[in-house]
Design a protein with these regions (language model features):
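Glycine-rich phosphate-binding loop of ATP-dependent small-molecule kinases
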Residues: 1-318
Length: 318
């Protein structure tokens, strides 16, 4: 990482319901003097894959209603048909990062004219990059015909329009004095051995990030046990069903719950400890990409109990 006053990128990662969003809110509450001590700039600009996961589920609901089938998730297990969609999500937020770097918050007119096509195309392009998928929406159109596909798109229009609007609202006119915050969670099946098999875990997903991101990122990992994560997830899902703190926004609310079988099958463990044990540099995550090894600077462990405010530790810029 180049010597500089502020971290260009801070990644928040942990198991679900571990306090990433609460910690992000805490960062936003800090004064400039306080954030300077952590080598952070202003942190309101974010990159988060949760809105895309949420949109996948809503698109699937529309597809099942209109077309009689789903695109991303198995209706019975509620898990991905193909777990390589974890890679799809990384490629989506790679694109978001570079759109942010352009510092142009004006939405291109062609996207405004058809926000559904814009989002469906983004999913297809990102998925194809993993090497594991065809162009799914293109194939849906061929399978069901123009009229039925048009009805499906109409069902998805409002959702896609909101995602488009919020994506560009998140793009600043300048990155001067800012730290871009990434938020995402990765894991693997309960009881899995290490290394986790692709596409599970941080080892797989981090290696898909663009080199520029890996070269400029530090990671703040919030450490909780899977059991703590399960319990907090159940609590916030219940609060969500009761209508507490809900929002029409596609952005992350504190009350989105992950299905319990998904918690067990995809977040029953993670590979952060395993990766740290492989690193020749203590406290760094070693990530291999395209024949190079990147060491993500510096793990700041926030070991916390669910419900308590996380305390950030000061780290050294290198």
């Amino acid at each position: 990482m180049q010597a500089q006053k502020h971290l260009p990128i801070l990644m928040f990662s942990s198991l679900p319901a571990s306090g990433k969003s609460e910690s992000r809110r805490y960062l936003k509450s800090l004064t400039k003097e306080q954030t300077d001590k952590f080598h952070l700039g202003e942190t309101s600009t974010q990159v988060d894959d949760y809105p895309y996961v949420d949109a996948m589920r809503k698109i699937d609901a529309a597809a099942e209603k209109v077309l009689g089938e789903t695109v991303f998730f198995d209706p019975k297990s509620t898990m991905f048909f193909n777990s390589y969609d974890w890679g799809t999500l990384v490629y989506m937020i790679n694109d978001d990062y570079f759109d942010i770097k352009r510092c142009d918050p004006k939405i291109p007119e062609r996207f405004c004219q058809d926000p559904v096509e814009w989002l469906f195309n983004r999913y297809d392009v990102a998925a194809v990059k993993t090497g594991q998928f065809p162009s799914r929406f293109f194939n849906l159109k061929l399978k069901h015909g123009e009229a039925k596909y048009k009805e499906f798109k109409k069902e998805c229009h409002d959702l896609c329009a909101i995602i488009l609007k919020e994506k560009y609202e998140n793009i600043p006119k300048s990155l001067e004095g800012k730290t871009i915050v990434f938020e995402f969670a990765r894991g693997g099946p309960e009881g899995a051995s290490f290394p986790l098999k692709p596409p599970f875990g941080y080892e797989y997903s981090l290696a898909l990030f663009d080199k520029e991101i890996l070269e400029n990122a530090a990671i703040l990992y919030i450490w909780v046990t899977p059991e703590m994560s399960y319990n907090k997830n159940l609590q916030r899902a219940k609060e969500g069903q009761e209508g507490k703190s809900q929002t029409v926004s596609t952005q992350l609310s504190l009350n989105h719950g992950v299905p319990h079988n998904v918690m067990k099958g995809e977040y029953g463990t993670d590979d952060i400890d395993y990766l740290l044990g492989l690193s020749p540099k203590k406290g760094y995550l070693p990530i291999k990409k395209d024949g190079e090894e990147f060491h993500i600077n510096r793990i700041s462990e926030s070991r916390k109990r669910i419900g308590q405010r996380s305390r950030l530790k000061k780290w050294k810029m290198e």
